[in-house]
Design a protein with these regions (language model features):
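N-terminal structured subdomain of primase-like DNA metabolism proteins
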Residues: 1-102
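Basic, glycine-enriched DNA-binding surface that flanks or lies within the catalytic cores of DNA
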Residues: 1-7, 108-194, 199-202
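TOPRIM fold recognition
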Residues: 1-16, 61, 69-72, 206, ...
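A broad structural signal for alpha-helix termini and local helix breaks/kinks
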Residues: 31, 81-82, 136, 224, ...
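Helix N-cap/coil-helix junction residues
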Residues: 33, 84, 137-138, 208
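Phosphate-handling DNA/RNA-contact segment within nucleic-acid enzymes
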Residues: 55-56, 153-254
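Terminal peptide-recognition signature
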Residues: 62-65, 78, 132, 163, ...
Length: 356
């Protein structure tokens, strides 16, 4: 008797490979997406908030929007679209019942977000505090400020740093986690997080400073206080959690006194697109936001970090480096990248003919 998808508990490597071999572009059409060519290797899904599919290696990547950074193969795609567990997604992809469903083109519907599930709190916050102050270089007073407001705490199970965004009634609506370990890249949002509710500091001026991540927000504030002697609390500050402006718009709705915006997002000067071309996603987005919000009557400016982000700037400044030193570091990184490209570039066909 054939097992249903729900009956699968474990899968062989061949079964997982079979599930991941299902064509993602066909899956996307089945979910109601409309493909359009976006480059030599990428296919963009219209009205998707930045969903790109790469048929050559059967992968997808979400560049912007609330799901910014989500990527993977066919299994991950089905898990994302239908909010399924890994076993159910694999069973759906390799089961006969899936083949019948995949041929049906149904309108795409964004799945309703479930309730926010906050990680359990640890008994203390020593590890999170140590990581943010000693490893990330953030001012102790600033870390304590957010911890005292229950916007930062330490997760009980793994010791991760937890950052919480609240709505106007004080209800947690957004939660992101970051490993409190040096050299770890782990970070993720908690189940049910709504990125339109930012991690924030409510100031008193008419200026809002927009960063990408909570650590960026606190790093920018630390630079303001420790290196320029200004009151970091005077201005409003939010982190968007991605390169999507949902959090900006929601914060502006609740703070009509704000008339000036500073976009202090990442300086992705070494980032590349899927075709290998340099693409400074952070600054491209900042330029787009300047155009949009200037058109809406706001005074806008961009504060570009010298290195990749303001936390990198802060950590280097803590070592005694000047802003001129940071600029030299950036130029050295770019020069090394350009030299690497030049070394890998194939010889010109005309030059090859001359040598023969």
């Amino acid at each position: 008797m054939r097992r249903s998808a729900a009956a699968y508990q474990k899968f062989t490597e061949d079964e997982i490979r079979q599930a991941n071999s299902v064509d993602i572009l066909s899956l996307a059409r089945g979910y109601g997406y409309e493909p359009e060519k976006a480059g030599r290797k990428a296919v963009h899904m219209k009205h998707s908030g930045g969903l790109y599919i790469f048929p050559e290696n059967n992968r997808f990547f979400q560049w912007t929007g609330p799901d910014d950074g989500i990527k993977g193969g066919a299994i991950d795609f089905v898990m994302r679209e239908e909010n399924l567990s890994f076993p159910k997604a694999v069973g759906k992809l390799i089961g006969k019942e899936y083949a019948a469903e995949a041929r049906q083109v149904t309108p795409y519907e964004k799945k309703e977000r479930g309730p926010l599930v906050l990680p359990e709190k640890a008994d203390n916050m020593k590890r999170a505090y140590w990581y943010l102050v000693s490893i990330r270089g953030i001012s102790p007073q600033i870390v304590s400020h957010f911890m005292n407001r229950k916007m930062i705490y330490q997760e009980k199970k793994y010791g991760n740093c937890v950052f919480v965004g609240y709505d106007a009634e004080g209800t947690p609506r957004y939660c992101s986690m970051r490993a409190a370990r040096e050299n770890s890249s782990f970070k993720m949002d908690a189940t049910g997080s709504d990125k339109s509710y930012p991690f924030f500091h409510e100031g008193t001026s008419d200026l809002l400073i927009v960063t990408e991540a909570p650590i960026d927000l606190m790093s920018h504030a630390s630079i303001t206080a420790d290196f320029y002697g200004r009151d970091w609390m005077e201005d409003h500050r939010i982190s968007t959690g991605c390169l999507w402006n949902g959090a900006i718009d929601r914060y502006l709705e609740g703070h009509p006194q704000i008339r000036r915006l500073v976009f202090a997002v990442d300086n992705d000067y070494l980032a590349r697109d899927k075709d290998g071309q340099f693409r400074n996603w952070g600054q491209l987005t900042a330029a787009k936001w300047v155009r949009e919000y200037t058109g809406r009557g706001f005074q806008c400016a961009v504060h570009v970090p010298h290195l990749n982000d303001f936390n990198t700037d802060l950590m280097e400044r803590r070592k005694g480096r000047t802003v001129e030193d940071l600029d030299r570091l950036r130029m050295a990184e770019l020069e090394a990248e350009f030299n690497r490209d030049a070394a890998e570039e194939p010889e010109n066909e005309d030059e090859q003919e001359m040598e023969t």
